[in-house]
Curated annotation (Swiss-Prot):
Listed pathway(s): Amino-acid biosynthesis; L-arginine biosynthesis; L-arginine from L-ornithine and carbamoyl phosphate: step 2/3
The protein's name: Argininosuccinate synthase
Keywords carried by this UniProt record: Amino-acid biosynthesis, Arginine biosynthesis, ATP-binding, Cytoplasm, Ligase, Nucleotide-binding
Matching Pfam families: Arginosuc_syn_C, Arginosuc_synth
Source species: Bordetella petrii (strain ATCC BAA-461 / DSM 12804 / CCUG 43448)
């Protein structure tokens, strides 16, 4: 039985994730005028481009909401963001520059906390502004039904009557004006922006074209570091972790993780740290392009990974990275609270993050240009005397020890050489001729 309602449920309570923008404002007013009973829910995610959160519910009431609530999601957002960082739950990257899954993290928090608030109010129908081509329609669908199994979904943007009457921004603006609300469309940007405290996403419109890039973007969390007229001074920064939790920046301790994240954003933002341009695969397997900001998470992640590599052994780090990529993809798909994701996340938090205690000092310059200056931790397994090129007393191993170790390697070297000549016999490799080893066949010869 479908949980998606194709038409407006007249006479019933309908919760709408209300941003206060033109789309959700017009949708709320339209639903009220058509006979539904709209309830507005606004998530305070610490969006850097929002000035007055308290005004948003008031506007919703003016537009016809039966009730309007502002839900403070900031603490939960930061908690989930740090959990993602601890697990390295980031699978999209280009040449080592990471997208920190800030939108998927935000959707996990919004989708659960808003639906939980609706459930408290006896509202079991939910609508939001996600379109059928994007990732969010599936993320919100999953998180909503996980939170409230009785939930039904109504999306104005999937209702043909709504589309026919209010199919574009011009029509929505005129609809608001005729209803007595002086709602003027904001100037159209060359791209759309979605943000929360962890990061910002810029995409669509001109950014759909790959010959249009970061230079048309106006950052909202930091500086346009690529511009010559923007002054960016080098800055020395220290980040301290205790058992996987970031606790101090530049020697200042923060009891509130939200305040720490805000300060990390300010520090990283002064340099444009954490901006990236990514081509990614959406949930439906079509490729999209986005330009991202995440100055605070980027700063914390640099320090965290430095400590991880100095504390853990190679096999643990390999498992952390492989599991992190898998977990990042699950997060991206809206599966952050699925059992397989919880298993990967809890493992990383317990066996990787809990050992991460220490302080990293780095110098930030422009964009993602930085240098590591110092790494300190009581848990470091890095011991320079083990491999020092100088003569040391009580050396952990001797030349004779290494001779023995290399001699043992003869076993697998012999096996490998025999296997290569086995491949010659099967025709997979060409005979060596004048070369010391068999060669890959040249199909042109």
């Amino acid at each position: 039985m479908t949980t998606i309602l194709p038409n407006l449920p007249v006479g019933q309570k309908v919760g709408i994730a209300f941003s206060g923008g033109l789309d959700t404002s017009a949708a709320l007013l339209w639903m009220r005028n058509k006979g539904a009973i709209p309830y507005a829910y606004t998530a305070n995610l610490g969006q850097p481009d929002e000035d007055d959160y308290d005004a948003i519910p008031r506007r919703a009431m003016e537009y016809g909401a039966e009730n309007a609530r502002l839900i403070d999601c900031r603490a939960q957002l930061v908690a989930e963001g740090i959990a993602a960082l601890q697990a390295g739950a980031f699978h999209v990257s280009t040449a080592g520059i990471t997208y920190f899954n800030t939108t998927p993290i935000g959707r996990a928090v919004t989708g659960t906390m808003l639906v939980a608030a609706m459930k408290e109010d006896g509202v079991n129908i939910w609508g939001d502004g996600s379109t059928y081509k994007g990732n969010d329609i599936e993320r919100f669908y999953r998180y909503g039904l996980l939170t409230n199994p009785d939930l039904k979904i109504y999306k104005p943007w999937l209702d043909q009557l709504f589309i026919d009457e209010l199919g574009g921004r011009a029509e929505m603006s005129e609809y608001m004006r005729q209803a007595g609300f002086d709602y003027k469309m904001s100037a159209e940007k060359a791209y759309s922006t979605d943000s929360n405290m962890l990061g910002a996403t810029h995409e669509a419109k001109d950014l759909e074209q790959l010959n249009s890039g970061i230079r048309i973007v106006k950052p909202i969390m930091g500086v346009a570091f690529w511009r010559d007229d923007v002054a960016v001074k080098a800055e020395e920064v220290s980040v301290r972790f205790e058992e996987g939790q970031p606790v101090a920046l530049n020697g200042v301790e923060y009891a509130d993780p939200v305040e720490l994240m805000l300060e990390a954003n300010r520090i990283g933002g002064r340099h444009g740290l954490g901006m990236s341009d990514q081509i990614e695969n959406r949930i439906i397997e079509a490729k999209s392009r986005g330009i991202y900001e995440a100055p605070g998470l980027a700063l914390l992640f640099i320090a965290y990974e430095r400590l991880v590599t100095g504390i853990h052994n190679e096999d643990t780090i390999e498992q952390y990275r492989e599991s992190g990529r898998k977990l990042g993809r699950l997060l991206y798909q809206g599966r952050w609270f699925d059992p397989q994701a919880i298993m990967l996340r809890e493992t990383a938090q317990r066996w990787v993050a809990r050992a991460v205690t220490g302080e990293v000092t780095l110098e930030l310059r422009r964009g993602n240009d930085y240098s590591l200056l110092n790494t300190e931790s009581p848990n470091l397994t890095y011991a320079p005397e083990r491999l020092s090129m100088e003569k040391v007393e009580n050396a952990p191993f001797t030349p004779a020890d290494r001779i023995g170790q290399l001699t043992m390697r003869n076993l697998d070297i012999t096996d490998t050489r025999d296997k290569l000549f086995t491949y010659v016999k099967t025709g997979l490799l060409a005979s060596s001729g004048g070369a010391a080893l068999p060669q890959l066949k040249d199909a042109k010869k």
